Amino acid sequence: MTDPDSSGFRRTVELSSGQRVTLRSVEPGDRDAVADGYRQLSTSAAFERFHTLKPELARATLDFLTEVDHRDHEAIGAVDPAFSRGVGIARYIRSEAEPTRAEVAVVVLDDWQGLGLGRRLLEAVRDRARDEDVTCLTAEVMSDNERMLGLLRAMGPVSLDRSGSETTAHLPI
């Protein structure tokens, strides 16, 4: 994901390391950058986010991940301005059955983890969801993904429903 002038959401944030990144709306032109970012993920990071392993994301998946309407499906990407490359993405997808609920997901490149970027991305996508009348975010998380579960707990009161290897988190916003 490069840093072109895209429409919609844009914010610069500082991470715990002092590094600054630009958070902005994901657009269809980010397709190649999202594919490249997926290839840069470690096996464990890719599995924790997608719950499966694939060598490449399919064209239809890339289209789905980048062609968002910014209302029922929002995606916010983090861009490292020093290198104009994407380093993380958070998104929500509104539930058709329960329009005030949306599923949320976050992925951060391995070398950017532990700097507070996941939290900044989750805060941004939470704020966008709230702007669109979503009142609860849900997340399907691998039960042993303590980093993501900890991030969700840090965002506020969260209820967790564990079922085997997956946990569903419910975060009122």
Residues covered by each model-derived region:
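Long, contiguous binding/interaction regions
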Residues: 1-173
